[in-house]
Amino acid sequence: MTCDRMENMLKYPKEVNVMKDIPMFTTEFGVASLVLKEVPYRQEAYIRVRDVQPGQLRELLGECISFCRMVGAERVYATGHDELENSAYYGSVIQMRGEIQADGSLVENLFPVTEQTVSGWREICNDRLRDVDFAATLTAADESMILSSGGAYFIHRQGELLGAGWLEDGKLLLLCAVLPGAGERVMHTLLSLTDGAPLELEVASSNLRAIRLYERLGLIRTKEITKWYKIF
């Protein structure tokens, strides 16, 4: 890893005040879930419409937007109601699945994340994924979950960090490359742990580079999990 790359990573805020989601935000117009944990990091909030009075979607969203803005959101997205199709489509979360084998010529060295390295692993992942739509920011509160999963790794080649990844129960939860063009080697190195078993992952529709890689390896799109619309 170069000094410039390390310097850029250290510019990412190590910790800010954690903001909790609101599972049931109730108004006279209906109920929604407010996803607020990304507000301190990305200034983004997400609204999942749960229930709405007839003809009152705009009013419900107005209440939600006002609250999200009050806590610092500069961009607000929503899902969960057919009438949202009248708003500007922003992007989707897509599920992909397949059975693929690792290419042994592209498999590098895996180093499991430990208590001593989990904070650095998390910061690297946050830095590399900060501009990827719908990528959740990992906080210090997530470290115990990361460690207990036993599936978080650094990937190295000849002593140089290529990237990081996280596998759990047949799901690829996270993949990021530190070096340009290293994504395929990082992916094959993680695949070496699956022994050809079915693999599932979720990816943003806007992350075309990742989708092309996954499709080239043999994964197929199986479901549009969530469709998001920009409402502020």
What are these regions (language model features)?
Residues 75-78, 84-85, 146-148, 165-167, ...:
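Alpha-helix C-terminal capping segments
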